[in-house]
Amino acid sequence: MSKAHIIGFGKSGVAAARLLKKNGWEVELSDRNTSDSLQQKEKQLTQEGITVKLNYSFEPETSLDLVIVSPGVPWDLPALQRSRETGIETIGEMELAWRYLKSSSWVGITGTNGKTTTTALTAAIFQTAGLYAPACGNIGYAACELALQDTLPDWVIAEISSYQIESSNTLSPQIAVWTTFTADHLSRHYNLENYFNIKADLLNRSQIQILNGDDYYLHENAAHLYHNSYWTSIQGKANLVADVTRGIYLEDGWVVALQEKIIPVELLQMLGSHNQQNLLMAVAVAKFAGIENEAIAEAVKNFPGVPHRLEYICRWNGVDFINDSKATNYDAAAMGLKALVAPILLIAGGEAKEGNDNDWLRQIKEKVVFVLLIGSAAEFLAKRLQKINFLNYEIVENMERAVIRGAALSKKYDAKTVLLSPACASFDQYQNFEERGEVFRQLSLGLNHKKKNDIRFGSSRI
């Protein structure tokens, strides 16, 4: 019996373990952590015949035939390097799913920003057209969960991160989309060139490539990579990288794809030019899949957006509270500010990331009346604000204080919106950006239950 070891006890790791067990493998699953919840999962998986090792650091063994890596595990981990050097096949969970789901067609969507919204909208269009096309990867299902289902998908709509691409050596989607490219995850990938090449590799292996021509870096650096690629632009056909016959663009208020009018852009409910860019890419995918315009229009009209991305939470005393927790870098946070009407009270901070913050700082100067800083990056971001002589900021440390203080200051500064758009990772205070956004949501919704004086003066008695 072949033996596999899965690293990581999250949703992806558990799904990979169950998939291999179902297909006759001897399976062990490990995680460096231990907790009550993991121990409960351990009991269940042990009953299924899967060996679980908690509080365990992986080391390759000669008895292993396969090592599966969950998305959050660094690909250059010394133990994984030794595994590869000794000839043990070492792949990611997404690659494993691909091998079991080759009978389904795949859409692979990658990019620094925009991939979650594009993935969710694409899946919504396909499902409106009557196809079983679940979203998976970074959102929705773990990819291996789809391979475990009795009914296999017509299409797999996969949001694929750079981490997942580098651990997937044969993953070759029929259609691949590259949404944006900016400096991110450099602590993982070391330099911009390496990060770019990892993203590009997914498109190299795909049959149809769709790229966002409104992204400056892609426009300047990716045009020569793919000879028959398709390009989008919200700025019209004059801005297309490709010939107009391979373009998807806006013209006279319409989405035009491959020289055919598809839908009026006004059907899109989401705010911001970046969401129009996402729309064009999703429509392009739909047309290559043969979906009718009526289904595209119906799906776009009813698509509300994705949680934690410019998500409207509530209105308190005439001020809107907006959750943009998924803005984990400067470029995404700048896009969020561009999409909203000034004056804005901004909550930012978390775990700092490398990147160019010039556009983000420019948007703050133009649109923001006050900034509340949270997390380990608070002092660093305060210094960046001082550099542009923006002194309307306060370090409040945590989200609870930020929401209370934001509610109080919103009246003083006549802000239309209190916006959580961190421009930082979440791992200093939260498990992920979703948890951070949920905390913001609950605190914002709870404002109506606070004492008026506590909110009026931004009380920290909480």
Swiss-Prot record:
Protein encoded by which gene: murD
EC number: 6.3.2.9
Reaction(s) catalysed by this chain's protein: UDP-N-acetyl-alpha-D-muramoyl-L-alanine + D-glutamate + ATP = UDP-N-acetyl-alpha-D-muramoyl-L-alanyl-D-glutamate + ADP + phosphate + H(+)
InterPro entries in the cross-refs: Mur-like_cat_sf (IPR036565), Mur_ligase_C (IPR004101), Mur_ligase_C_dom_sf (IPR036615), Mur_ligase_cen (IPR013221), MurD (IPR005762)
One Pfam family cited in the UniProt record for this chain: Mur_ligase_C
Keyword terms: ATP-binding, Cell cycle, Cell division, Cell shape, Cell wall biogenesis/degradation, Cytoplasm, Ligase, Nucleotide-binding, Peptidoglycan synthesis
Function: Cell wall formation. Catalyzes the addition of glutamate to the nucleotide precursor UDP-N-acetylmuramoyl-L-alanine (UMA).
GO cellular component, one term: cytoplasm
Keyword ATP-binding (UniProt): yes
Organism: Trichodesmium erythraeum (strain IMS101)
BP GO terms, sorted: cell division; cell wall organization; peptidoglycan biosynthetic process; regulation of cell shape
Entry binding sites for ATP: 111-117
The protein's annotated pathway: Cell wall biogenesis; peptidoglycan biosynthesis
Chain ranges passing through the membrane: none
Subcellular localization, as worded in the UniProt entry: Cytoplasm
Name used for this protein in its record: UDP-N-acetylmuramoylalanine--D-glutamate ligase
Family named by the database record: Belongs to the MurCDEF family.
Entries under SUPFAM superfamilies matching the protein: MurCD N-terminal domain (SSF51984), MurD-like peptide ligases, catalytic domain (SSF53623), MurD-like peptide ligases, peptide-binding domain (SSF53244)
GO function term, MF aspect, one: ATP binding
